Amino acid sequence: MTFYDHTAIEPKWQAFWADNHTFKTGTDASKPKFYALDMFPYPSGAGLHVGHPEGYTATDILSRFKRAQGHNVLHPMGWDAFGLPAEQYAMDTGNDPAEFTAENIANFKRQINALGFSYDWDREVNTTDPNYYKWTQWIFTKLYEKGLAYEAEVPVNWVEELGTAIANEEVLPDGTSERGGYPVVRKPMRQWMLKITAYAERLLEDLEEVDWPESIKDMQRNWIGKSTGANVTFKVKDTDKDFTVFTTRPDTLFGATYAVLAPEHALVDAITTADQAEAVADYKRQASLKSDLARTDLAKEKTGVWTGSYAINPVNGNEMPVWIADYVLASYGTGAIMAVPAHDERDWEFAKQFNLDIIPVLEGGNVEEAAFTEDGLHINSGFLDGLDKASAIAKMVEWLEAEGVGNEKVTYRLRDWLFSRQRYWGEPIPIIHWEDGTSTAVPESELPLVLPVTKDIRPSGTGESPLANVTDWLEVTREDGVKGRRETNTMPQWAGSSWYYLRYIDPHNTEKLADEELLKQWLPVDIYVGGAEHAVLHLLYARFWHKVLYDLGVVPTKEPFQKLFNQGMILGTSYRDSRGALVATDKVEKRDGSFFHLETGEELEQAPAKMSKSLKNVVNPDDVVEQYGADTLRVYEMFMGPLDASIAWSEEGLEGSRKFLDRVYRLVTTKEIVAENSGALDKVYNETVKAVTEQVDQMKFNTAIAQLMVFVNAANKEDKLFSDYAKGFVQLIAPFAPHLGEELWQALTASGESISYVPWPSYDESKLVENDVEIVVQIKGKVKAKLVVAKDLSREELQEVALANEKVQAEIAGKDIIKVIAVPNKLVNIVIK
């Protein structure tokens, strides 16, 4: 039996593509453009895992498809190479992070090339290259000039073990750091901030302009957190002090019975009475040790301390005790709230705990038992009595403004972006602080401000970065003799990744970030593929920088990424015991189709879980490529199920994909190829061209592969294969299995040219008219899908089409298929356990 030799074929075509610059980006201005972007990887020491190629294969299929359709295609790759892991590794091992990073990049590049991706390597970028970060620094200077980068003394999330402050987004719900799982404490420090809040409304509005998953848009909307309400000013009794609260429910002001300030609020010390001073100071100290997430956890016990002072409720003159409590954050809103315990669960719990008044102002519920949080007509509310919510809000805002004690207000949950890191391995911030108290940006002519090479990269522990120790770099003197110090903080890893897609467009430009005409030609990115874990941070930061650059006239579009697609996660094979605990794969043996714990003998349940070193279920793509070939890995990952689904890795599935490619190879190399068309394959061939074209365009790669299988089955039943159909079929499969595609194209044409730019096959509508039939797919006897398929499909073909269907895939995910009963032209019944 004939098999294709991937160990010979794949390196041969990889060398051909490299030698011939096959995937150099097209520049023919008469052609349409297609910009396919992958989220570039952080080059870790571990190398690629099989999750990386899933998204990369998807963009590669699209890129190859669009080239064949006559587009100029920009399909680049680069490295997000600054950041904590390399620095941490360097400190642990004594290695230079630059050397470690360069080795990792070389390994990643080797692995990526072995998978046959059609990247234009002339456009490779590396965020740690001074020629790249010159422009990261240039963008920072523009932010600084526009007042969007500023210094502030802010309470930060300090991680002693990392020697740096981290952003709110990098703190886990349990109050530890995302990287390393270390304790996080709050401490005030001088930090660089970026004023992303100035763009809050545009970041919200322009989500309507892009084709993104609604779930991702919702995550960004929630993060931006727009609220419409009112600011209300409360005077502190017997003082000249006052404070402002923002509330979305000014209509409930008659029910406000106490106020709560954040422990860090500027007013706290001024209004705390002598007999409460010690308790307040003690409480402030405890609050400083908690992260924002820990403080605002709804499930935690309510704590607080009375300041000894009272505020005056402006609408009824009632006295309201002023408390401090850690669930109110100084960084959120005004750092103060009016508490309406009758209609807010957290306020109600607090009021019950500390025996504070609870006055209902909305009809309904029993506020002695629980807070009433639904809507009702107003009661106990003077001039608002009997009004509904909308009318009462409008009337109260009118009253507040007339009395001069409040006004209508729109607020956002979004906070400014904490931009500085007290670490070595990042872009230096191009600012000089002079001894006369002024600060200036490093002029463009002196950029890049290069990160100095130093042996001592341990955190200083003082809150400054290790750059504070490099005195010959640190200290500068102006022409007028004034001395200065360079900024020692560095930028976060998010900086370089906020604009890299722009540099790919013109990566070697030494005069500007990128040429305007090229930016006009290529923007926006047509498809951006990456993990949903970047839904908020990276995507929000990149959109923010893009909008700033749009305002500066640098980029021609309001949004960077027109379409976003999140691939699912590839889960590892893993096992659970009766307690639900995961068991490492090296502790498991298979007997008679079941799985047992090697040490205890307990029978285990197979349960897919995220691949991890501890479970010993990480699959290295190098091993798969060596055993099965890159084309098999690509086809398998695209055929596993819908691209956005999370699916378990399966060795059997891999073997199935390899067998399919062997059948393809045999079909084209051993079948008699003839110049005359018998017509026997007219319908299935034209159906296949139509289906694959439409499904690739919609990124439904699994159903496209299922249709290719249908064609192979049909063609194998014929003695001869019409040469045009053989060529067309090879073109259809080439984006999925490019090495095999090239090899078979040469077998059919001997052209010596790559298949990459051969025009995509078209189909003949008139050949599709033969009757289709609707079949039903049943699982456990219940109809789960109805499919329209070609009449007279064999049992095997019917089974393949049914099992590739998205609805069916969802139903059978993670379950054992006992048998499949296919009745041609009628139904498919799937029996699962």
UniProtKB/Swiss-Prot annotation:
Q: What is its EC number?
A: 6.1.1.4
Reaction(s) the record says it catalyses: tRNA(Leu) + L-leucine + ATP = L-leucyl-tRNA(Leu) + AMP + diphosphate
Task: State the top-level EC class.
Answer: ligase
Q: Where in the cell is it found?
A: Cytoplasm
GO-annotated molecular function = aminoacyl-tRNA deacylase activity; ATP binding; leucine-tRNA ligase activity
This protein's source sits in the domain of life called Bacteria
Which portions of this protein are annotated as coiled-coil regions?
A: none
- For ATP, which residues are the binding ones? K613
ATP-binding: present as a keyword of the record?
yes
| GO CC, alphabetical | cytosol
InterPro entries for this protein? aa-tRNA-synth_I_CS, aa-tRNA-synth_Ia, Leu-tRNA-ligase, Leu_tRNA-synth_edit, M/V/L/I-tRNA-synth_anticd-bd, Methionyl/Leucyl_tRNA_Synth, Rossmann-like_a/b/a_fold, tRNAsynth_Ia_anticodon-bd
GO BP terms: namely: leucyl-tRNA aminoacylation
Motif 'KMSKS' region in this chain: 610-614
Gene3D superfamilies from the UniProt entry = HUPs, Isoleucyl-tRNA Synthetase, Domain 1, Valyl/Leucyl/Isoleucyl-tRNA synthetase, editing domain
Motif 'HIGH' region: which ranges?
41-52
Q: Which Pfam families match?
A: Anticodon_1 (PF08264), tRNA-synt_1 (PF00133), tRNA-synt_1_2 (PF13603), tRNA-synt_1g (PF09334)
Which key words tag this protein in UniProt?
Answer: Aminoacyl-tRNA synthetase, ATP-binding, Cytoplasm, Ligase, Nucleotide-binding, Protein biosynthesis
The family database entries (CDD domains) matched by this protein are listed as: Anticodon_Ia_Leu_BEm, LeuRS_core
Q: Which NCBIfam families match?
A: leuS_bact (TIGR00396)
Query: What protein name applies here?
Result: Leucine--tRNA ligase
Q: Which species is this record about? A: Streptococcus pyogenes serotype M18 (strain MGAS8232)
State the encoding gene. Answer: leuS
